[in-house]
Amino acid sequence: RDVAPSRGLGDVYKRQKIEDPFWGHMQELVTDVVIPFQEDVLNDRQPGVEKSHAIENFKIAAGLSQGEFYGMVFQDSDVAKWLEGVAYSLIIKPDAALEKRADDIIDIIAAAQQPDGYLNTYFTIKEPEHRWQNLLECHELYCAGHMMEAAVAYYEATGKDKLLKVMEGMAGHIIDRFGPDKLPGIPGHQEVEIGLMRMYHATGNE
């Protein structure tokens, strides 16, 4: 059933301002240094840092690039956490260029989503026949939860719901496959729970 969505964290952040010099400086470091650095890492543009391939994995899964999956099974979560960080950064320090780059990455993520709603670059590229077969170790629900959190944060920060719609599709895919008389099992790493909760708070859809 549908219920009225509750106030999200974006509203809380918009009403608050850090004035303490120490924590204010930490906040500036995140917006001005950490987020740009991590963006370069995710795009394999940072010299002297181990290749991430995280954005490239999404491009390959979307059919926008050729190649093999590289990284850990949970590599997608790095992109999700960067997008969530960008969302909170945009609330306190609007940046049209950064927002446009985030929008472009969201377009790639949306293109990587499979027709049945599934979203995970490792299994889409490397082992499509083994989806949902190793919940304890393969982090599919973990990655989904982080991307759900990113989708909600970005929606609350910008009003743009493209990633939110993508993750509603993934949530529907999960619901179709788990539950009574469906796939049994529990995730090996908590995260999808808070992702689903935040999706509910943002959309009101159970």
Regions found by a protein language model. Name each.
Residues 1-9, 13:
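Single conserved hydrophobic/aromatic residue that forms the stacking wall/gate
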